[in-house]
Amino acid sequence: MTDTLDGGYADPIQAPGTLEADWQAWQGWAGLPEAALDAVTRVVVVAAHPDDEVLGFGGALAMLAASGTEVTVVAVTDGEGSHPDSDLVTASELVRLRTAETRAALAELGAADSTVVRLRIPDTRVDRFEDEVAARIAPLLDGADLLVAPWTGDVHGDHEAAGRAAVRAAASTRTPCWLYPVWMWHWAAPGDPRVPWRRAALIPLSSTALERKRAAVGRFVSQIAPLGPGPGDAAILPPHELAHHLRDREVVFR
């Protein structure tokens, strides 16, 4: 391993993360402007993997759906690479599981009638298909007020590549684009200079939206609970990690 800002871990996502209590105590929340959702009539939300859209933007999706906004979710990959060393679940079984989990989660958000577009790009290799992803997202933006995608600085290869492709698609169609972090809450610290806080905006969640988001996150059983006792079947998002995504606010970069 090479020395890094994360105490010797070459991969910040594998390093011990920032506690949610530290984020909750951060005084910087008060300085973030709010991102308005009231003018959005059609939104396209990009997820590098099934569950990203709920973890990073699920509360906002619940509020948008409740207001009558038309929702399209673009799953860039099917998430088949989440447990490559599992002795219990194959990649094809994960595709089936995670696709069903997405539909169940959207129903919990009150967005059961959302359109879900699966691009079927290979998991862990989105960077090799950025041109294709951008080209396939662009026509989906016809009539959309907003495109939302994973943050391009999230320190996760698929998230960053999906975000870059979305930014390109948005630019080509002149569609406003917001980017949501997922793993940033793990590897960054409050006020972290690696994070573009000047571009950040806050989305306060109503109590109903937060309740819906909690229920939606709970539908991703393949990610939040162990598939079995072996190390290759461990939960991808254990409770201390999920805590970052179950707070009463979400953040986007604009």
Regions found by a protein language model. Give the residues of each.
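Short, acidic Gly/Pro/Ser/Thr-rich loop/turn segments
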Residues: 81, 185-187, 210
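Active-site beta-strand->loop->alpha-helix modules in alpha/beta enzyme cores, enriched
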Residues: 2-179, 214-221, 231-245, 252
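A generic structural signal for solvent-exposed, polar alpha-helical segments
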Residues: 15, 29, 184-186, 226
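Short, flexible loop segments at boundaries between secondary-structure elements
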Residues: 172-194
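A conserved mid-domain beta-alpha-beta active-site/ligand-binding segment of alpha/beta enzyme cores
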Residues: 189-229
